[in-house]
Every structure is written in structure tokens, then in C-alpha cells.
């Protein structure tokens, strides 16, 4: 049996390497005994296309999944295909299960801002914690609000937050234990631990 996770993000080869390294570090920190093969697939539509192709060509027993931003709050994390159909008009591939669609709710930046200690360690004393979005109901916040507040809170830091290389550098340093408080991250870990 093999396992493969297609991840949204990282268009350049360098960023794809950083993306894989960051998610690998995060999953190892979560204590996964087996690791899926990780592929940084570029934009979310490209991740979905790569997932569909791999799902169609899978061997018996293989676990193929994708991890994409939900882009909007999710009514029911256990029914991601319903959300993806409503939001993106993505049809669930034949034979695909809900466990194969994993969501970062509402975006990867939500996971990043959830670990305040990790952010302080990564950005140092110039991080403006008061400018970050409140932790309460974090996954119900609009992705642009989360992203903009993260950029604003780090604007005076020498390594101010930007999508791409810098986003993966900070993601790699986050605590899986802290992120486990987020329902979407907890679901990712539960699914991977059950399926690997």
C-alpha cells in the first residue's frame, strides 16, 4: 500500500521543495509513524487535477488524498466534497471518499496564525501580536482577513510574511500540538493516522 498527498501551493521548483519540507516537518512533529508521499501541486485547481489523475490510476489499497485551502468557512468538515462542490463546482471523483479531501480552513495562513508561540519564535520581538486575528473561531474568518492581518503583524520584521518561500519557512517551525486545536488540522491528523 502506498499513500500520496497532493498539496495546494508552491509553483516554482524551489517553493515546491520548501512546501514538501514544511509539511513533512509538521506531520513528523505530529507523530505520524508512516508518512505519505507529498507532492506540492501548485494552484488549487492543479492540486485537484493531480488528485483526480492519481485517484483514477490508484492500485488497490492505495490512499490518495489532497490538501487544499477551503477558501471559505466550511459548514461540515466531515463532508468536504459538499463544500468543494458548492464553492468550486468540483465533482467528487467516482469512488472517492470524504477522507480523501482534506481542507485547510480557510487557508494555510489560518494554521500559521494559530501558533502564537511559533510566530513569536520565528519573527522575534518586532512581531505585532495585537494585529493578528483573534484565536476564537479562527477557522470561520475570511481568508483575506487572516492573510492581511498576518502580513500587517509582520510588516516590521526583516522576514515579513509573504506567500511562497517565507510562508513555508514559518510553517515548518509550527507546533503540531498547538495546531491540533484547529478542527481542520485535527481532522487531517486523524485521517492520516487512520489511513496510513
Label the model's feature ranges:
Residues 1-2, 13, 17-38, 48-196:
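C-terminal accessory helical subdomains adjacent to catalytic cores in phosphodiester-
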Residues 5-7:
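Short hydrophobic beta-strand that contains or immediately precedes a catalytic carboxylate
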Residues 42-46:
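Short, conserved secondary-structure transition motifs
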Amino acid at each position: 500500500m502506498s499513500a500520496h498527498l497532493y498539496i495546494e501551493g508552491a509553483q516554482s521548483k524551489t517553493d515546491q521543495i520548501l512546501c514538501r519540507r514544511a509539511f513533512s516537518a509538521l506531520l513528523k512533529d505530529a507523530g505520524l509513524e508512516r508518512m505519505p508521499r507529498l507532492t506540492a501541486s501548485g494552484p488549487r485547481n492543479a492540486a485537484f487535477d493531480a488528485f483526480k489523475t492519481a485517484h483514477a490510476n490508484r492500485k488497490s489499497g492505495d490512499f490518495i488524498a489532497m490538501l487544499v485551502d477551503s477558501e471559505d468557512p466550511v459548514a461540515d468538515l466531515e463532508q468536504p466534497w459538499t463544500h468543494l462542490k458548492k464553492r468550486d463546482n468540483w465533482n467528487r471523483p467516482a469512488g472517492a471518499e470524504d477522507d480523501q479531501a482534506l481542507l485547510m480552513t480557510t487557508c494555510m495562513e489560518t494554521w500559521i496564525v494559530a501558533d502564537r508561540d511559533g510566530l513569536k519564535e520565528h519573527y522575534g520581538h518586532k512581531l505585532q501580536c495585537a494585529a493578528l486575528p483573534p484565536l476564537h473561531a479562527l477557522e470561520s474568518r475570511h481568508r483575506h482577513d487572516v492573510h492581511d492581518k498576518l502580513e500587517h503583524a509582520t510588516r516590521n520584521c526583516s522576514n515579513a510574511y509573504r506567500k511562497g518561500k517565507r510562508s513555508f519557512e514559518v510553517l515548518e517551525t509550527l507546533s503540531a500540538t498547538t495546531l491540533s486545536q484547529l478542527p481542520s488540522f485535527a481532522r487531517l491528523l486523524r485521517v492520516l493516522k487512520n489511513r496510513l
